[in-house]
Amino acid sequence: ATMTLTDANFQQAIQGDKPVLVDFWAAWCGPCRMMAPVLEEFAEAHADKVTVAKLNVDENPETTSQFGIMSIPTLILFKGGRPVKQLIGYQPKEQLEAQLADVLQ
């Protein structure tokens, strides 16, 4: 399952020991809707290695502008509270796993 993030809980959520993959999305965004089931599957398959979380850009402008999100979906991987990888646009599951292989080892 994926976690829902907001401006209020964002900083706390990304501080943990486990890496957090954050999906910046919006309800009106077609590629974001395509991305949702991929992320659910990814989250279940790799729950022990990475936390998958979603942040609605329309409802959380502060965090969205803090990370300079220009196009969605944007996925950012955080480790120890710091962004270490950014993926922009729809990612099929195989591509997502290949991009994050170092985290999933």
Curated annotation (Swiss-Prot):
One of its GO terms (molecular function) is protein-disulfide reductase activity. InterPro entries: Thioredoxin (IPR005746), Thioredoxin-like_sf (IPR036249), Thioredoxin_CS (IPR017937), Thioredoxin_domain (IPR013766). Pfam families: Thioredoxin. Keywords: Disulfide bond, Electron transport, Redox-active center, Transport. GO terms for biological process: cell redox homeostasis. SUPFAM superfamilies: Thioredoxin-like (SSF52833). Transmembrane segments: none annotated. Disulfide bonds join C29-C32. Residues 1-105 form the Thioredoxin domain. One of its GO terms (cellular component) is cytosol. Participates in various redox reactions through the reversible oxidation of its active center dithiol to a disulfide and catalyzes dithiol-disulfide exchange reactions. Belongs to the thioredoxin family. This is Thioredoxin.
